[in-house]
């Protein structure tokens, strides 16, 4: 199968959080354009009073699709080409997408509850 180097993927972020006004969730980068086949790392940092879990979602045209729920530090969750890990000490999580495909083009959401 031949890869098209001109194929681009757009990865967008939105903030989705169920936290109080003094709590904060920050995602980076806010938007990203990558080539098909690249590896992408999306970051989510947070400052919350009462942490229960961190959730990742992918939103295409309709309602967001659940990807991962992370509650414990250092335990990597995987699903196909996607993986995520949580660091509760440093208050952040990453979402990795390997071998990106055009179907990965979407809005990715990080939420803390």
Swiss-Prot record:
Subunit structure as annotated in this protein's UniProt entry: Alpha-beta TR is a heterodimer composed of an alpha and beta chain; disulfide-linked. The alpha-beta TR is associated with the transmembrane signaling CD3 coreceptor proteins to form the TR-CD3 (TcR or TCR). The assembly of alpha-beta TR heterodimers with CD3 occurs in the endoplasmic reticulum where a single alpha-beta TR heterodimer associates with one CD3D-CD3E heterodimer, one CD3G-CD3E heterodimer and one CD247 homodimer forming a stable octameric structure. CD3D-CD3E and CD3G-CD3E heterodimers preferentially associate with TR alpha and TR beta chains, respectively.
Keyword rRNA processing: no
Protein species of origin: Homo sapiens
Subcellular location: Cell membrane
Name of this protein: T cell receptor alpha variable 36/delta variable 7
InterPro entries according to UniProt: Ig-like_dom, Ig-like_dom_sf, Ig-like_fold, Ig_V-set, TCR_variable_domain
Function, in words: V region of the variable domain of T cell receptor (TR) alpha chain that participates in the antigen recognition. Alpha-beta T cell receptors are antigen specific receptors which are essential to the immune response and are present on the cell surface of T lymphocytes. Recognize peptide-major histocompatibility (MH) (pMH) complexes that are displayed by antigen presenting cells (APC), a prerequisite for efficient T cell adaptive immunity against pathogens.
Residue ranges of every copy of the Ig-like domain listed in the record: 23-113
Spans through the membrane: none
